[in-house]
Amino acid sequence: ITSSSGNWSYAGGGTKYAAALLSTWCGPVKSDKAYNVNGWSNAAYKLESAISVDGKNLNKDAAAREKMKRAIVKYGAVTFSYNNVREAYYYNPSEESGSSPHACTIIGWDDTIPAENFYPSKTTTDGGWLVKNSYSSLPYFYLSYEVTCEQIYAFDYVMNDKYDNNYFYDASATDSGIGSLLKIKQAANVFKVKGDTENEWIKAVGVGIVGENTDCTVEVYSDVQDGSFNPQNAKLETTKTVYLEYGGFNCIELDKPVEVKKGSTFAVVVKVNNAYITLSENEGESYVYRGGWTPSQAVRIKVFTKNDEKNQNSIEFMDEGQVKVRGNGGIKQLIITMSENEELKDFYVESINFDENKEKIVTLPSGWIRIENIRYKAFLWDNFENISPECSEIEW
């Protein structure tokens, strides 16, 4: 079952289906839970991204393999499927017949394995992927670089308390064929704030795309009129442009959360230039731009929000070397690190009492100015013992 006409959450057979389901925050569920528990209410974590690596040239293109390696380093592992016939520690099944798809996880690689080590098909390329298998009889093995890999995904999760709500319309495991036919580069979803008792804060936007190496622009609008969408009739709250190296489902965190009022209607527009936005097979208040905004099948655009942040902890980098910190009470430690190429260069610590004032502007020492290729991370800790639920990590 892969569409909204049945229970599509039972869809199986590939990591692409898993990515679509996990992006709705159904699962993952810890192994000590019963197999039939509700995946949404028992999710151990929330998925932010499920990026897709193009595997069609991995068996013949060194540059494609380097891109795969970067994904493994960034996300820790990638899932994939290949045609499997037998078990072998150095395996190359590329010329075997009677094989069937088998899903595994790649956790590393070794470029120095001699080609002649791989069995049974002949191999001319040295090196292979280190695979974590699901078979206890062969828990780990090396798969030749010359093997064709499919449905390659890396999943990135966050703690459950980072977001409270996930707004979306797409509810199918498979993409709509119309999306691939039209190759939509601009799309929008319009949502009404779910809660009627408190405001919410939009913190991130997720989008499903086919393609890679693309610029992606996200725009958030408030004061949207019910029943239609036209950016000219709404208020632009924020915009952010990022570069996406991989396809699949990417999460774009906003530089500053956008407050949306209870009961109000908001919209999110996504634009890409070297890819296209995917659609699902069901309906929603979605729009695509083709010379004008027209209603469409549900686009795979999701919005992650946090309930009213007035009582939450948050950190915001400002200009002129300042940081705005909001706390929900008590004494907390603000820690800011400066790094270059993942190497720690400097750090700053300040103790802040939020009992008297819930918000404070912290001015950093001289030298803490915007520098190209320098990454800043900010954390809010409770007395160095427990990390705050709203720990922020923001590029500045």
Regions found by a protein language model. Name each.
Residues 248-250, 358-362:
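Short strand-edge motifs at loop-to-beta-strand transitions and within beta-strands
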Residues 266-270, 370-385:
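Short, aromatic- and glycine-rich surface loops/edge beta-strands on solvent-exposed regions
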